[in-house]
Design a protein with these regions (language model features):
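Substrate-binding groove of N-acetylhexosamine-processing glycoside hydrolases
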Residues: 1-152
Length: 152
């Protein structure tokens, strides 16, 4: 049995703690900062409580905090991008990039983490490459979203 811990919004770390207490391996999928269909700023039915930016992920992701416990029962982390709420293929890149890069950093990098300012600068330096490759790079931070920006 492997437990997928995902309902952070409803029960915080309860499922994670119970799984570890009973010696079950866990995959962290907290529904805060890992659902990439959530936009950076409010849009359609996504209120401010269901938005997040690169900084939120990098500094506040409950799944990342769990992985950093270095408990051998914590197997890793997942993220999701649900398209059942009107998110079309055309909209996907702006939700994935650059936020997926923070999640990849948390999932795979084992060295000392950069502070957020330096990480953000590294992301901005790579933006042009992503755009040249045909990816639509969305705003990284809420403060970068220009008035009138459309998520669709």
């Amino acid at each position: 049995i492997v437990i997928q811990w995902w309902n952070y919004r409803g029960h915080k770390e309860l499922a994670l703690q119970n799984a570890i207490k009973h010696h079950y391996p866990v995959i962290c999928s907290s529904n805060y900062y890992t659902y990439l269909n959530f936009p950076v700023t409010p849009w359609r039915g996504y209120t401010n409580t269901r938005t997040f930016d690169l900084k939120d992920i990098y500094q506040n992701n409950p799944s990342d905090k769990a992985i950093n416990q270095k408990d051998p029962l914590i197997l890793g982390m997942t993220c999701a991008l649900w398209t059942d709420d009107g998110v079309t293929e055309r909209m996907i890149d702006r939700r994935l990039f650059p936020r997926i890069l923070a999640l990849a950093e948390q999932m795979w990098y084992q060295g000392e983490r950069l502070d957020f300012t330096r990480f953000h600068q590294n992301i901005l330096q790579r933006k042009e490459w992503f755009e040249q490759m045909g990816f639509e790079f969305g705003p990284a931070l809420k403060s970068e979203v220009k008035k009138g920006y459309q998520w669709d």
